[in-house]
Structures are given as C-alpha cells and as structure tokens.
Swiss-Prot record:
GO biological process: translation
Any coiled-coil regions, as ranges: none
Any one annotated GO CC term: small ribosomal subunit
Record-stated family: Belongs to the universal ribosomal protein uS7 family.
Protein name (Swiss-Prot/TrEMBL): Small ribosomal subunit protein uS7
Keyword NAD attached: no
Function per UniProt: One of the primary rRNA binding proteins, it binds directly to 16S rRNA where it nucleates assembly of the head domain of the 30S subunit. Is located at the subunit interface close to the decoding center, probably blocks exit of the E-site tRNA.
Gene Ontology terms for molecular function: rRNA binding; structural constituent of ribosome; tRNA binding
Assembly and oligomerization: Part of the 30S ribosomal subunit. Contacts proteins S9 and S11.
Keyword Ribonucleoprotein annotated: yes
NCBIfam families: rpsG_bact
InterPro entries, A to Z: Ribosomal_uS7, Ribosomal_uS7_bac/org-type, Ribosomal_uS7_dom, Ribosomal_uS7_dom_sf
Keywords annotated in UniProt: Ribonucleoprotein, Ribosomal protein, RNA-binding, rRNA-binding, tRNA-binding
Amino acid sequence: MSRRNRAPRRDVPPDPKYGSRLVTMLIRKLMMRGKASLAARILYEALDIVRERTGQDPLPLLENAVRNATPLVEVKARRVGGATYQVPVEVRGERGTSLALRWLVTFSRTRPGRTMAAKLANELIDAANETGSAIRRREEVHRMAEANKAFAHYRY
C-alpha cells in the first residue's frame, strides 16, 4: 500500500462550444502528446459529421452512445490461496464513463477510414444504435462477469 495521500479528484470544466463536461472528457481521451486543440478540432468535426448524417443535435446522441457503451459490471483479478480468481465487481459511475470513452476512442482509431473525425463519428453513431466495437466490448465484459458469478463472494 502506498503511504502517500491520494490525489484529489479534479473537476472537469465544461467545454466552450457545447458547455458539456462529457465533451471535455472525450477531448482529453482523444488528446495525444498534449495537443488539446487538435483533439478538440477532431471531436467538433466528428460532431458536425454526426449532425450532418443524423439530422439531429449531436450532444444527446453522444450522451446516448456513452451510456450504451458504459459497462455495469467488470471482473477484477483476486488472489486467494495460490489461485487467481476473476471476481465480478460493480463499476462505479465515473469509471464506467471513463471506460466507455476509452473504448470509443480506441475502437475509432482502429476503424478503417480516412480521417479520425469520420471514424469517431461512425463509432459514435454505431454506439448510439447499440452496434459497433465499443458495444461489443461492453457485452464481452458483461459476459465475463456473468461467467464468473460463482466467485462473487470473493468481492473486495
């Protein structure tokens, strides 16, 4: 165990264009090598593509996509006696959102396509429609937790 104090949670400021904390969180997940303005430009472009394709406000669609990709349970490794068990645990809200955003960005990067904005827009639309790689990943995590339900009594 670490002897140091835990770092306090930093509050996430809302982004300037949409006034949404979720958008800021997604910009930060997209960002590579500290290039926040580039990440913001990519996300805003992706949201414009979403608006163009669906003909509706992209913010509720983004919230819906994140909600659909958020896992409710996950498995954590727990050593008991010489064996390591995959113990299902509930996911706290903030971690669930963080995982969903991470999966959306990761699977957007692996998608075939021309620009990152287009790939992200496609992944968001797919997640909002409950398809796509991020949703598949959530289902996989849920299946793992369901399969290891027998070890739930080892919970932390």
